[in-house]
């Protein structure tokens, strides 16, 4: 029974990291598309849009990095 619990912890950690990567890629893809759309509509605002784009992209990318850290913690500290 203990092996089953360990296997479930590994599966949970892998799903956590995988879903975080999928969510980040979808979020950054949508964000990049909206940035290009805004730059095409208002070329004069590209510097402002670029600054806001990188700030929001960093925030969108921070959550999956936290999930990857938690997933690795579960894999190596809790399950290992």
Swiss-Prot record:
It is found in: Cell inner membrane. GO terms for cellular component: plasma membrane; proton-transporting ATP synthase complex; proton-transporting two-sector ATPase complex, proton-transporting domain. CDD domains: ATP-synt_Fo_c_ATPE. PROSITE patterns: ATPASE_C (PS00605). Its main location: membrane. The chain crosses the membrane at residues 11-31, 53-73. It comes from the Bacteria. The record marks 61 as: Reversibly protonated during proton transport. F-type ATPases have 2 components, F(1) - the catalytic core - and F(0) - the membrane proton channel. F(1) has five subunits: alpha(3), beta(3), gamma(1), delta(1), epsilon(1). F(0) has three main subunits: a(1), b(2) and c(10-14). The alpha and beta chains form an alternating ring which encloses part of the gamma chain. F(1) is attached to F(0) by a central stalk formed by the gamma and epsilon chains, while a peripheral stalk is formed by the delta and b chains. F(1)F(0) ATP synthase produces ATP from ADP in the presence of a proton or sodium gradient. F-type ATPases consist of two structural domains, F(1) containing the extramembraneous catalytic core and F(0) containing the membrane proton channel, linked together by a central stalk and a peripheral stalk. During catalysis, ATP synthesis in the catalytic domain of F(1) is coupled via a rotary mechanism of the central stalk subunits to proton translocation. This is ATP synthase subunit c. It comes from Aeromonas hydrophila subsp. hydrophila (strain ATCC 7966 / DSM 30187 / BCRC 13018 / CCUG 14551 / JCM 1027 / KCTC 2358 / NCIMB 9240 / NCTC 8049).
